[in-house]
Amino acid sequence: YGCEDAFLAPGVQKLAWQMLEEIEPHTRGLVVAVGLPVRFESGLYDAAALVVDGRLAGLVCKQHLAGEGIHYEPRWFRAWPRGRRATLALGGRSIPIGDLRFDCGGVRIGFEICEDAWVADRPGAALAARGVDILLNPSASHFAFAKDEVRRRFVLEGSDRKSTRLNS
């Protein structure tokens, strides 16, 4: 949230890509998720990049934007359509983008980004039906007292519904 209108600046988007490219070679033997704004076709998307063993595996874009109260994500980003998958051509690379599921050595990983987890028809339900083993939820929001406990309870309840387990 700290970038606010700077999300729209091409320089910020370019710097985010440069930082991702700088991180990539340091992920050998690791699976790493990195958040960044992604320009695709005519829109800007709030995305999570999954980097696996030094290589960008793909980008998952947020499907539900927070737009009430102090949240105004629609000012900067577009919501990604559920089920849509595409390819982003960037710097000579073809990068999978969209509503993706990743297979990392037999472990299936999916994402729902922040607000995606707070809606009734959350992407996690569809990802569970697609057989994900691990559901990642990168989140950032304003400060509130005891918010960490609210998030923990929320994740535990969602895990129970999906027959998954949370270890903390």
Identify the function of each model-found stretch.
Residues 1-168:
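Enzyme catalytic cores with a strong preference for nitrogen-chemistry domains
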